[in-house]
Swiss-Prot record:
PANTHER family: BIOGENESIS OF LYSOSOME-RELATED ORGANELLES COMPLEX 1 SUBUNIT CNL1. GO terms for cellular component: BLOC-1 complex; cytoplasm. Residues 63-95 form a coiled coil. The keyword Coiled coil applies. GO terms for biological process: endosome organization. The keyword Transferase does not apply. Keywords: Coiled coil, Cytoplasm, Transport. This is Biogenesis of lysosome-related organelles complex 1 subunit CNL1. Component of the biogenesis of lysosome-related organelles complex-1 (BLOC-1), a complex that is involved in endosomal cargo sorting. Residues 1-21 are annotated as: Disordered. It comes from the Eukaryota. Residues 1-10 have a biased composition (Basic and acidic residues). Belongs to the BLOC1S4 family.
């Protein structure tokens, strides 16, 4: 009996949101969360690398650590690329949102 009532609730909620705006909202919020997390991670990594680089310069230990630091900076660049991809997804969501808003307005006329 509960299966039928939960199924009817799912059908009703799907009928209430035929364009999937609720899912789009959840996806948007999750994407913002991921972007915020990436930015914080990049910030921490950058700060750590800069501190290490400063220590290297101050202590004069340059030869062996430069290659390691370059590899770390390459990792940071990869994270930045991933972050850029997330922003592109946000932009696509905004385009989709404008499309659905326009479609919704035209449907009401």
């Amino acid at each position: 009996m509960q299966d039928n009532s939960s199924h009817s609730r799912e059908s009703a909620s799907a009928g209430d949101d035929p364009l999937g705006i609720d899912k789009l909202t959840v996806d948007y919020d999750y994407l913002l969360y991921k972007i915020r997390d990436y930015v914080q991670s990049i910030q921490l990594d950058t700060t750590e690398l800069c501190k290490k680089q400063n220590e290297v310069m101050v202590n004069g230990i340059i030869e062996n650590t430069i290659d390691k630091n370059i590899a770390k900076f390459k990792e940071l660049l990869e994270k930045c690329d991933t972050l850029e991809n997330h922003y592109e997804m946000l932009n696509q969501l905004a385009i989709d949102n404008r499309y659905f808003q326009g479609k919704n307005r035209r449907g009401r006329k």
